[in-house]
């Protein structure tokens, strides 16, 4: 009974969390539950979105699998800006410098808007087709469907940029409930509009992208209202870009650019694996991997929610020069991840067909996807370790360690392993390239975390002395 009361006390959501002095485990649980719920709901949305599209036919499902690298690229840029801002803004709040925290957030917003220009080529079929042909797509209908979906990225990216930075601002202040409610509004409306736009209006794959745009716009209205009432840091929706922001853009990029490259390396690695699967086993293997990734994401993305909660906690206490509290935070993050991500991973591993059948795949695709899911989840303990310590790298400004680890995993191990295994194993067992790459990343993470902890221990002998603080 006492144990249950303790669990209930730790999981009770009370608005803002006390990042600097609250009990570490309960503070991180309070931050993590809304973050995990947010990514679960977001993953569920993408799952349902993909299910609706798969009902349009196999060519549409293959087209969506080719758009994954683009979607990852979009969020790679946002993760770079968001993580760079979160690390700097959280550090300034930990130092008690609210004005500099506000300036950092404002600069991050302007930077994110400026980066929206990168996605303009996806408005045009010619440039879109060039991109997708490099990923191995050749069928004219697949290329057309991929363009119809991705042409919505440039206008939607403006809305996503605003929401991403604002949600990061709330997390820096210990508030993860408002980002959760934003996603409930945006993705809830998206789920309602998806079948209407896709089937009732007959817009097909374009309807899925249009529903995303409308849902995001509704969520933005909610965020603008909450900024006025629940945040000490105010951000305008209207673009605010000045040359005086350049120094802050440099600091954000120093932390965020390695994060962007890290996530982009995942996109490049996925595109390379798509090529290997398509060339060796045909489009059926690509479709099966897409289905497997969507189902597996139900478990894996909870880890991203815990990471999102851990970065502001670590950066705030890094600003306070409290290494002991940071170590306790990472240990607590490992415990929470083992329970939530590990538990969900086990459920998905045991019962994959319950979710796979939503896609109405052929019997062969369902069997291949189930094998891919089960083999991949075998490597989850190593993934949990790597992701938790990557949050540590980002929060302290050493995101380059995470970049090197991710490139090592995605490009130097996963792609060669997939190529080698495709020559000696059948389509049912090629998926062992995933756990192999996870093991390599965990070993690299262990080395970098040992180096960084030794450095911080030397630099932070006095945890309460802000004079030791540095920008990296």
Could you tell me what each predicted segment is?
Residues 82, 152-171, 179-190, 208-223, ...:
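Short runs within selected transmembrane alpha-helices of multi-pass transporters and secretion channels
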Residues 37, 41, 45, 74-78, ...:
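Residue-level hotspots within pore-lining transmembrane alpha-helices
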Residues 29-49, 152, 186, 215-219, ...:
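Transmembrane helical elements of multi-pass membrane transporters/channels
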Residues 61-121, 160-179, 286-352, 383-405:
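Small-residue-rich hydrophobic transmembrane alpha-helices
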Residues 1-32, 89-156, 200-257, 314-379, ...:
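Short alpha-helical transmembrane segments in multi-pass integral membrane proteins
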């Amino acid at each position: 009974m006492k144990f249950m009361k303790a669990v209930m006390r730790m999981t009770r959501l009370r608005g803002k969390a006390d990042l600097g002095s609250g009990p570490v485990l309960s503070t991180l649980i309070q931050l993590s539950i809304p973050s995990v719920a947010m990514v679960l709901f977001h993953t569920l949305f993408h799952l349902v979105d993909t299910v609706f599209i798969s009902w349009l036919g196999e060519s549409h499902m293959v087209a969506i699998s080719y758009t994954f690298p683009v979607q990852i690229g979009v969020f790679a840029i946002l993760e770079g800006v968001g993580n760079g801002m979160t690390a700097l803004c959280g550090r300034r709040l930990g130092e008690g410098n609210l004005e500099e925290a506000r300036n950092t957030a404002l600069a991050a917003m302007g930077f994110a808007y400026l980066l929206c220009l990168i996605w303009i080529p996806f408005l045009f079929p010619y440039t879109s087709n060039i991109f997708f042909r490099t990923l191995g797509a050749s069928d004219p209908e697949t290329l057309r469907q991929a363009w119809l979906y991705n042409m919505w990225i440039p206008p939607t990216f403006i809305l996503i940029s605003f929401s991403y930075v604002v949600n990061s601002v709330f997390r820096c202040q210990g508030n993860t409930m408002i980002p959760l409610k934003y996603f409930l509004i945006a993705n809830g409306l998206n789920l309602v509009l998806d079948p209407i736009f896709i089937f009732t209006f007959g817009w097909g794959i374009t309807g899925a992208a249009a529903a995303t745009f409308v849902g995001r716009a509704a969520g933005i209205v909610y965020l603008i209202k909450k900024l006025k009432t629940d945040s000490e840091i105010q951000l305008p929706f209207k673009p605010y870009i000045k040359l005086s922001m350049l120094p802050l853009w440099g600091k954000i990029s120093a932390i965020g650019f390695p994060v962007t490259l890290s996530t982009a390396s995942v996109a490049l690695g996925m595109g390379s694996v798509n090529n290997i699967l398509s060339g060796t086993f045909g489009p059926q293997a690509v479709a099966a991997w897409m289905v497997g990734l969507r189902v597996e994401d139900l478990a894996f993305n909870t880890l991203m929610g815990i990471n999102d909660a851990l970065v502001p906690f670590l950066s705030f206490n890094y600003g306070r020069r409290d290494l002991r509290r940071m170590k306790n935070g990472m240990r607590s993050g490992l415990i929470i991840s083992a329970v939530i991500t590990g538990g969900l991973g086990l459920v998905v591993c045991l019962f994959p067909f319950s979710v796979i059948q939503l896609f109405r795949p052929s019997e062969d695709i369902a069997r291949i996807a189930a094998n891919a899911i089960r083999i991949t989840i075998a490597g989850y303990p190593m993934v949990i370790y790597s992701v938790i310590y990557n949050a540590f790298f980002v929060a302290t400004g050493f995101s380059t360690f995470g970049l090197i680890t991710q490139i090592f995993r995605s490009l130097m191990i996963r792609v060669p392993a997939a190529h080698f295994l495709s020559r000696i194993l059948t389509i049912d067992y090629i998926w062992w390239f995933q756990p192999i790459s996870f093991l390599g990343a965990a070993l690299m993470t262990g080395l970098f975390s040992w180096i960084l902890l030794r450095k911080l221990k030397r630099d932070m002998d006095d945890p309460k002395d802000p004079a030791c603080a540095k920008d990296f």
